[in-house]
Regions:
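N-terminal capping segment at the start of a domain
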Residues: 29-61, 77, 84-86, 183-192, ...
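Noncatalytic luminal/extracellular "stalk/propeptide" segments of secretory-pathway proteins
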Residues: 36-40, 45-140, 144-150
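Soluble metallo-hydrolase cores and metallopeptidase-like ectodomains found primarily
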Residues: 107-133, 188-261, 272-279, 283-286
Length: 438
């Protein structure tokens, strides 16, 4: 029994009703005749608009603006629109700071949030050593996890260390986050997870200063305050067509910061594919979905799968536009990161057997993704994992990281028109070839 069958057996309920899908041919494309919706310039303009909405945490003003932007775009094309609620903890803070003498370090409070008194928690900053956990009892633990050059930030190891510090009796944690950029690197968090002590992230670029504070035994104050509570984002679903099997195009829209290279290419390509799709003479119905709640470990996607996704037997194809597959590469140098005009190599494309030869042809020459990984639920990452868990017979999905992944500096400049355009055209070529063979 697969995941979908388990959910059906448990009686998953829809979050919101949906009217009938618009018949094919209704509505007028937003793009004027002759416009190339797959041009790199057009894709880049959408990435810039998305980043311009600001921070994309679930239910934030930037996240809600993105949902409305998607809904308006798809509605103007003639799609039937449904929006469903995605409730998640409010991850914003009013203060996230460490002070030591006259030094002040503002950082990122790592969810799940645990707040300090408004006056902060005072104490000694003590290095976390797994071999002697009692060292941090009653103290503020200082956590650093090294990484190999070129590797992504070891988020899972940091998460384990935070939990271990809490179990050892630490009153709080300050983490110097190892990563390519030297900035804080937020970690995706299960929506039901709890942590009993406050955790402040600071960038690795501050590590030498933090080491000095620990070495001299200075008194420090850790302060994390905020509104707390929960807030609601939206999954936005667009349907088009009256009959035939479904083609599903999914992309996450939310994240900890502005998510330019992480989310931007998927956002832009989803919008472009929606214009292209309704111009095709194919015997299918189209469903596009932009999910909130992603940074809460795929929470919004999970709700969509439970309540709104068509059944696998009703679906001809599912293509997931995940993280960082259209981001740009960076070289790590002693002076810092140097942006390149080539695609980020830390990316993956996984596909079911029917799509592999089509992808190999369409993506030829595109490093890494020209050789798709065979579909394997035990190796799938990101929201494409849910697609495979539920047994959808035909599909493909991207995921990846990048040098600015989950950092406050992941802006629109973390991708380029020249990187995105060939990916966009290859995706459309594969989808078109698959559906014309139905």
């Amino acid at each position: 029994m697969n995941r979908r069958e388990l959910m059906v057996g448990a009686g998953a309920l829809a979050l919101a009703g949906c009217g009938p899908a618009s018949p094919a041919g209704e509505g007028l494309p937003v793009a004027a005749a002759g416009d190339d919706v797959f041009s790199g310039a057009r894709l880049m303009a959408d990435v810039e608009t998305y980043v311009g909405f600001g921070t994309h945490r679930t239910g934030s003003p930037g996240d809600l603006a993105t949902s409305d932007w998607f809904a308006n775009h798809w509605r103007e094309l003639g799609y039937e629109i449904e929006q469903t609620e995605v409730e998640a903890p409010n991850a914003d803070t009013t203060v996230a700071r460490l002070t030591a003498g006259g030094a002040v370090f503002d950082g990122f409070a790592q969810p799940p949030l645990s707040f300090t008194p408004e006056s902060g928690l005072a104490g000694k900053l003590v290095r976390w050593n797994p071999a002697s956990p009692a060292d941090v009892s009653g103290r503020i633990a200082y956590v650093y996890v090294a990484r190999e050059p070129g590797a992504v930030s070891p988020g899972a190891a940091y998460r384990q260390a935070f939990q271990a510090c809490a179990e050892a009796g630490a009153i709080g944690v300050v983490a110097a986050m190892s990563g390519p950029s030297g900035e804080v690197v937020a970690i995706n968090t299960p929506v039901t997870m709890t942590l009993t002590i406050p955790v402040l992230q600071l960038g690795e670029k501050l590590k030498s200063q933090l080491d000095g504070i620990v070495d001299v035994g200075s008194d420090v104050t850790l302060t994390i305050t905020g509104p707390g509570g929960a807030r609601k984002g939206k999954n936005t679903i667009a349907r088009y067509g009256a009959e035939g099997p479904w083609v599903i195009i999914s992309t996450p829209q939310s994240g900890w910061f502005t998510c330019g290279g992480e989310r931007g290419p998927g956002i832009a390509m989803s919008r472009a594919l929606a214009v292209w799709a309704i111009k095709q003479d194919l015997p299918v119905r189209w469903l596009f979905v932009a999910t909130s709640g992603h940074e809460w470990t795929d929470h919004g996607a999970d709700l969509f799968h439970q309540n709104n996704a068509p059944e696998p037997a009703e679906t001809a194809l599912w293509w997931h536009l995940g993280a960082s597959y259209g981001a740009r590469a960076h070289d790590e140098t002693p002076e810092g990161l140097v942006a390149k005009d080539t695609p980020n190599p830390v990316r993956a494309l996984m596909a079911t057997p029917d799509l592999v030869p089509l992808i190999e042809k369409a993506f030829s020459g595109q490093a890494v993704i020209e050789t798709p990984m065979p579909a394997d639920v035990s190796k799938a990452l990101g929201e494409y994992r849910l697609v495979l868990e539920e047994g959808y017979p035909s599909g493909a999905g991207f995921w990846g990281g990048n040098a600015h992944f989950h950092t406050p500096i992941d802006g629109a400049e973390n991708t380029t028109p020249a990187i995105m355009e060939p990916i966009m055209r290859a995706i459309a070529d594969v989808i078109g070839a698959k559906l014309k063979a139905l």
